[in-house]
Structure formats: structure tokens, C-alpha cells
């Protein structure tokens, strides 16, 4: 079937099971071929082909609402709703988004990117439906990994309490990105082996209703028998106890079983949870055999061999530099522990996990718990290293404020994927952390200019004993600089001069330092002398350096790959104002006040005007022509 000709899912209504099976093969082949060129979330989507087709066949989108938790498994949904022809632009600048996007299609009713949000949003939609007295199904699709998130459990509790009509699809592939952890995962494991609980339960209830009601004792005994048999028949009744009708487990690749169960769910009042078992990566052997999450999201790859197409790496990944330095220090300090909220592979903690399994803690998709747990460990003299993506640190903000900073606890937060991350887009850009951490009392915030300074700042963080400390580091690779063999602590709150200059100064840090250095060299050739400063401590700033620089009364330009509002540049302006430098000319470059969508980092930097050319032009406008050297 030519998938690019699909306009909407209505064509599925008249298709037979054999035709649907052929469509499944076509979709898998299409995904494998297209994503081999663009990259993307291949394994999650190969696992939900039949489930997605079944949902679109039995329900009527967009009247009926599908909410894809996390959203990375929505590619099949996009194909069935008329977007197959756009897959060549997947996750590229101004191309097809890798997550549901309301402006893309009326079938995308809820935008996602972070996990565990679908149930709360679905509850909101269902309550709105009931208040408006309309009739449509609300169907969140959530994975077993996302179900470990506290927000999802809060929503389950509320939905069950209110007895709201809703069909929750639990897509259980036994993995989120890496293998799942936690007691709830173990409950689901028991449910997988318990058989078709709901059919047996119905027969049981029918039989028990036939027992003659000869007095209250017999009736009470019958109810006790029913409850006892319910616990005997299935080793976990977690969802039933929350108020849901539990249906399953059902084979998520068997159309007959899917149709049977979903039709039953449609007729059932109140909240229903359909437990669907799927195989992540189904139909592509390299993805099927992946047990650590390598094929969850990929770049381009060779279909035949399953080898990834990677540019030749001349420098280590930032995540590896940080995690391997932590590992090196952990070998001589038993107090060091590593903590991750379900991202051991992305944060490059596999080596730490292998060498120190008892000191490597993966809490699952539970950022709030991970953060406060780290705080608890710090109270007992441990040295917790919390490795967390910038975008996911947003989810634990209250814990950072209330539990870490307020108590001034020694927690080292490794803020991975800081700055623009590219193809994953606006839900994953790490551009807000400076603004939401800089104003917190007791917090120290750093970002290195290269991987050598990075390892020294990791050492600095592990030696620091006066409170919380955080290190920002980017996605991707370092610069390939020579690494010192001996680690050293860098004095807190100190900056360094990278290039001397007399007519203007650029203050920056991290990934924008090469841009600043190149701009300064070009300006030098044009007769403009510009100082470049490595402001590696975003907080506390180097106040002595700032006093000296502001005293020279030369134009200052701050550059940051982070949001301008509340950012580093704002801090410099505040310092100048509070210290009486009212005539100082300070301008800022950074991320504007909007969400930055998907695309390559290079393209996104061009789009927002954060380039070497833009820096050169800005400095020229800040320096009067008569002050420029001939």
C-alpha cells in the first residue's frame, strides 16, 4: 500500500484482518526505511503498529481523543492521519515533529515530549466532555515506564475515585528507554502471567449471582468467596483497587484479541484500563534484540547490518567526560553515588553501574523522587551525583528549592543536555535551567569551556562542601582538547581571560566560547580589540573581575545558549545596576522569549541570530566608529 496517499484513518473501517496485517507489514517497512535516513524513535513505533491501527479502526479520531504519553510512539498515528509523505523531513528544521503537535493535525489533540502527563490531560478532557454533555471517548496511551511517574499515579487515583468514563491503554513492553525498575513494574510482570483475568471474573460473577440469597450470611459468604477468588485468580489487582475495570493482558500484535478487548472496553462504564503487551522494536531484529535501549531513539543506520551511521568522533561525548570523571573519583571515595531517573544510557553511566552496582541508583521516570532522595543521602554524609537532563530537571524544581537549596545540602547535579538539543525540539531544549537556578540561595552553577575544564569542574564539585552545586554540559561531543592527567579544583566564582582586548568585552561560557573567540579574532583583523572572558561560574559571578571590567567603561556583550530573561546576562546587568555602574553599556545575546522548535543546532542558532556573524555585527554597533583602530 502507498502510505503517502493516506489522508485520514477512515479507510481502516472496511479492512479485513488479513488486509490489516498486510498494512502492518507496510508500515513497519516504511518506518525502517525512512528512519534509517532521518533517525528517530524507531523501536517504540515498531512496537505499537497493530495497537495504533486497532485504535483508529474502532474509534473515530479526532472526535475521539487519543493522547500519546511521551509522544515518541506517535509515528504510526501520524502515518494513519495523512502525514506519511512528510517523513523525509522528520525532526528537521520546519519539518515533521517527532512528537504530537496540535498545529500539525487535528488528530493531535495533546502535545507531549515529557512522560506521565497523558492521564491528567485525559481527565481534564473527560471532565470537560461531561460538563458540556458531549459524547466521545477519551483514550490516553501510556507506557509501563511512564506509569512509574508520580503524576501518572496521582491521575490514576483521581480518575478511579471519580469513576470517570475513560479508556486507558497501558502499552507494556517491559521497557521505557532502558529496562524498567520499581515495584509497579513487578506488579505488571505478575499481571502478564496471570491470563485473561477479566473474562474469568465475569464468569465468576455470573455464577455467584446464581447462588440463592438465603439470608444475609449466604450473601456475605458469596461476596467473600468472590473477593478471595479474585485475589487467587490474579496476582495483582492494583488497578481494580484504584477503581478501574482491568482488561487484559492482551497480545498487542493480535488483531482479533485487540478488537475483542477494545470493543468490551467501549461498552464498559467508568474508567477502564486495557493492559496491552507489545514487543518494542517488533519486525526489525536489531531493535527487537536490544535490551539496554540503544534502539529507543537513533540517528541514521544501515538497514541490513543494523550499524549506526556516525560521523568520526574526534572528541568524547560531554556526558562521558562527566560520568567517567565521577567514576574515577568514586574509586577512591566510597561516599560517591550516582543517581539517574531512567537515563543510565543517555547519561553514560553504564560503566559506573557495572563497576559499582550498589552505588548506582536508577529510580525510573521519577525526577522528583530522585532529587529528594539525593538530598536525603546528602544528610547522611554521602556525595550524591544526580545526572539529569536539563529539560527533566524542570520536573523536580520544588525539590531543588525546598529539599536541596533550602537545607543547603551537598548534592552535585549534573545538568546534561544543557542548551539547544536539536531534533527533539521544544519539549527537550535545555534553555531554562540558568534562569530557574540562578536566583536560588546557596546554589553554585557552572559550565566548562571544554572537556578538560569539565573534568576539573567535576572534581571541584566533588570537593565542594558548602552546599548544592550544579554543572551544565551540552549534548554531543567536546572539542577534542588535551586532557590533564591530574585533576585540580578551580576556585569557586572565578573567571578567566581567554583573550585580551581594550575596546569591548565578551562574557560567555560553555558552548558559545568558540563563537566568541572566532568573532573576536575577526574583529581584531578589522581593527577592533575585544576581550573574551570565560565566565565559567554563572553563579556566583566573579565580582572582582566584574568591578575591574566595569571600571574600564567599555561595552560589554554577554552571550549564552539559554533564555535571556533571568539568565546570565541579566545577572551582569543587575550587578552593574546594584553597584552604581549606571553608564555601563551592556547588551545580551541568547535565546529569545519563545519556545525553540526542532532542527539541527546549527540551523536553530542561525534562526535565532546566535552566530559568529551576529556577534561581530553586534560589537560593531556597540563601538562608535571613531573609537575603532584604523
Swiss-Prot record:
InterPro entries: Dxylulose-5-P_synthase, THDP-binding, Transketo_C/PFOR_II, Transketolase-like_Pyr-bd, Transketolase_BS, Transketolase_C, Transketolase_CS. GO terms for molecular function: 1-deoxy-D-xylulose-5-phosphate synthase activity; magnesium ion binding; thiamine pyrophosphate binding. Keywords: Isoprene biosynthesis, Magnesium, Metal-binding, Thiamine biosynthesis, Thiamine pyrophosphate, Transferase. Its cofactor is Mg(2+); thiamine diphosphate. It catalyses: D-glyceraldehyde 3-phosphate + pyruvate + H(+) = 1-deoxy-D-xylulose 5-phosphate + CO2. It comes from the Bacteria. Its EC number is 2.2.1.7. This is 1-deoxy-D-xylulose-5-phosphate synthase. It comes from Bacillus mycoides (strain KBAB4) (Bacillus weihenstephanensis). The lineage of its organism: Bacteria, Bacillati, Bacillota, Bacilli, Bacillales.
Amino acid at each position: 500500500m502507498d502510505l503517502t496517499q493516506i489522508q485520514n484513518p477512515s479507510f481502516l473501517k472496511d479492512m479485513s484482518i488479513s488486509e490489516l496485517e498486510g498494512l502492518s507489514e507496510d508500515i513497519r517497512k516504511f518506518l525502517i526505511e525512512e528512519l534509517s535516513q532521518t533517525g528517530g524513535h524507531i523501536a517504540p513505533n515498531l512496537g505499537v503498529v497493530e495497537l495504533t491501527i486497532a485504535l483508529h479502526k474502532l474509534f473515530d479520531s479526532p472526535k475521539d481523543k487519543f493522547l500519546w504519553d511521551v509522544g515518541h510512539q506517535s509515528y504510526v498515528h501520524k502515518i494513519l492521519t495523512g502525514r506519511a509523505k512528510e517523513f523525509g523531513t522528520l525532526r528537521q528544521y520546519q519539518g515533521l515533529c517527532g512528537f504530537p503537535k496540535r498545529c500539525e493535525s487535528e488528530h493531535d489533540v495533546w502535545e507531549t515530549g515529557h512522560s506521565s502527563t497523558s492521564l491528567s490531560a485525559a481527565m481534564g478532557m473527560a471532565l470537560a466532555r461531561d460538563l458540556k454533555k458531549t459524547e466521545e471517548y477519551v483514550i490516553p496511551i501510556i507506557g509501563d515506564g511512564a506509569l512509574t511517574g508520580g503524576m501518572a499515579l496521582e491521575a490514576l487515583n483521581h480518575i478511579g475515585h471519580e469513576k470517570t468514563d475513560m479508556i486507558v491503554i497501558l502499552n507494556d513492553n517491559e521497557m521505557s528507554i532502558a529496562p524498567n525498575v520499581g515495584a509497579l513494574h513487578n506488579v505488571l510482570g505478575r499481571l502478564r502471567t496471570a491470563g485473561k483475568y477479566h473474562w474469568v471474573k465475569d464468569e465468576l460473577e455470573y455464577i455467584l449471582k446464581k447462588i440463592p440469597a438465603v439470608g444475609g450470611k449466604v450473601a456475605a459468604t458469596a461476596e467473600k468467596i468472590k473477593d478471595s477468588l479474585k485475589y487467587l485468580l490474579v496476582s495483582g489487582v492494583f488497578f481494580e483497587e484504584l477503581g478501574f475495570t482491568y482488561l487484559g493482558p492482551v497480545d498487542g500484535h493480535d488483531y482479533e484479541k485487540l478488537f475483542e478487548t477494545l470493543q468490551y472496553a467501549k461498552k464498559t462504564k467508568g474508567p477502564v484500563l486495557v493492559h496491552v503487551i507489545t514487543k518494542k522494536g517488533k519486525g526489525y531484529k536489531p531493535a527487537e534484540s536490544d535490551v539496554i535501549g540503544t534502539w529507543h531513539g537513533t540517528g541514521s543506520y544501515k538497514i541490513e547490518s543494523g550499524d549506526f551511521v556516525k560521523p568520526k568522533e574526534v572528541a568524547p561525548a560531554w556526558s562521558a567526560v562527566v560520568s567517567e570523571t565521577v567514576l574515577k573519583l568514586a574509586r577512591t571515595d566510597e561516599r560517591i553515588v550516582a543517581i539517574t531517573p531512567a537515563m543510565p544510557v543517555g547519561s553514560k553511566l553504564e560503566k559506573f553501574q557495572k563497576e559499582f552496582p550498589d552505588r548506582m541508583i536508577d529510580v525510573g521516570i521519577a525526577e522528583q523522587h530522585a532529587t529528594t532522595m539525593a538530598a536525603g543521602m546528602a544528610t547522611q554524609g554521602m556525595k550524591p551525583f544526580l545526572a539529569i537532563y536539563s529539560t527533566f530537571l524542570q520536573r523536580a524544581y520544588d525539590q531543588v528549592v525546598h529539599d536541596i537549596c533550602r537545607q543547603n545540602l551537598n548534592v552535585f547535579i549534573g545538568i546534561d543536555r544543557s542548551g539547544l538539543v536539536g531534533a527533539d525540539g521544544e519539549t527537550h531544549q535545555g534553555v531554562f535551567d540558568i534562569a530557574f537556578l540562578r536566583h536560588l540561595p546557596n546554589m553554585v552553577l557552572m559550565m566548562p569551556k571544554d572537556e578538560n575544564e569539565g573534568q576539573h569542574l567535576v572534581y571541584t564539585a566533588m570537593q565542594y562542601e558548602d552546599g548544592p552545586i550544579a554543572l551544565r554540559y551540552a549534548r554531543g561531543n567536546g572539542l577534542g582538547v588535551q586532557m590533564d592527567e591530574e585533576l585540580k579544583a578551580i576556585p569557586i566564582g572565578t573567571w578567566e581571560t581567554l583573550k585580551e582586548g581594550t575596546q569591548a568585552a565578551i562574557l560567555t561560557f560553555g558552548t558559545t566560547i568558540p563563537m566568541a573567540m572566532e568573532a573576536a579574532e575577526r574583529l581584531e583583523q578589522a581593527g577592533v580589540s575585544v576581550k573574551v572572558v570565560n565566565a565559567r561560574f554563572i553563579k556566583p559571578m566573579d565580582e572582582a573581575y566584574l568591578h575591574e571590567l566595569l571600571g574600564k567603561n567599555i561595552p560589554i556583550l554577554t552571550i549564552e545558549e539559554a533564555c535571556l530573561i533571568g539568565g546570565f546576562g541579566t545577572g551582569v546587568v543587575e550587578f552593574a545596576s546594584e553597584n552604581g555602574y549606571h553608564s555601563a553599556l551592556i547588551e545580551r545575546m541568547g535565546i529569545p522569549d519563545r519556545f525553540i522548535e526542532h532542527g539541527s543546532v546549527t540551523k536553530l542558532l542561525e534562526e535565532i541570530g546566535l552566530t559568529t556573524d551576529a556577534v561581530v555585527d553586534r560589537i560593531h554597533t556597540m563601538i562608535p566608529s571613531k573609537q575603532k583602530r584604523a
